[in-house]
Amino acid sequence: MQFFVYSAVAAGFGIAIAAFGCGIGQGMAVRGAVEGIARNPEASGKVTVTMLIGLAMIESLSIYALVVSLILIYANPVSTAMQGFVGLGK
């Protein structure tokens, strides 16, 4: 039973760390884009497109962390093996 509690806690910490890291990364990316547009307003179109592609890549990392967390909680492939290992299996 403790294994499932640890899985839920690990999933929570994993998504929290991923969200924190992605938020910091997105903030730094937007800051850099705004500074670049402030220095060269004519390049705002290219900078904006590049920034949006970068933000999508950063956000994909957060989505991957969410998928891994959901797998840890709901579809853990080693749950039956771990139940047998800790003595909860039949």
Swiss-Prot record:
Keyword set, alphabetical order: ATP synthesis, Cell inner membrane, Cell membrane, CF(0), Hydrogen ion transport, Ion transport, Lipid-binding, Membrane, Transmembrane, Transmembrane helix, Transport
Cellular compartments annotated: Cell inner membrane
Site (Reversibly protonated during proton transport): E59
Pfam families in the cross-refs: ATP-synt_C (PF00137)
Cellular component terms per the entry's GO annotation: plasma membrane; proton-transporting ATP synthase complex; proton-transporting two-sector ATPase complex, proton-transporting domain
Regions crossing the membrane: 4-24, 53-73
InterPro entries, alphabetized: ATP_synth_csu_bac/chlpt, ATP_synth_F0_csu, ATP_synth_F0_csu_DDCD_BS, ATPase_proteolipid_c-like_dom, F/V-ATP_Csub_sf
One GO molecular-function entry: lipid binding
Membrane topology: Multi-pass membrane protein
Assembly behavior: F-type ATPases have 2 components, F(1) - the catalytic core - and F(0) - the membrane proton channel. F(1) has five subunits: alpha(3), beta(3), gamma(1), delta(1), epsilon(1). F(0) has three main subunits: a(1), b(2) and c(10-14). The alpha and beta chains form an alternating ring which encloses part of the gamma chain. F(1) is attached to F(0) by a central stalk formed by the gamma and epsilon chains, while a peripheral stalk is formed by the delta and b chains.
Recorded family membership: Belongs to the ATPase C chain family.
NCBIfam families cross-referenced by the UniProt entry: ATP_synt_c
Biological function: F(1)F(0) ATP synthase produces ATP from ADP in the presence of a proton or sodium gradient. F-type ATPases consist of two structural domains, F(1) containing the extramembraneous catalytic core and F(0) containing the membrane proton channel, linked together by a central stalk and a peripheral stalk. During catalysis, ATP synthesis in the catalytic domain of F(1) is coupled via a rotary mechanism of the central stalk subunits to proton translocation. Key component of the F(0) channel; it plays a direct role in translocation across the membrane. A homomeric c-ring of between 10-14 subunits forms the central stalk rotor element with the F(1) delta and epsilon subunits.
Name of the protein: ATP synthase subunit c
Organism whose genome encodes this protein: Syntrophobacter fumaroxidans (strain DSM 10017 / MPOB)
Lineage of producing organism: Bacteria, Pseudomonadati, Thermodesulfobacteriota, Syntrophobacteria, Syntrophobacterales
Gene name for this UniProt entry: atpE
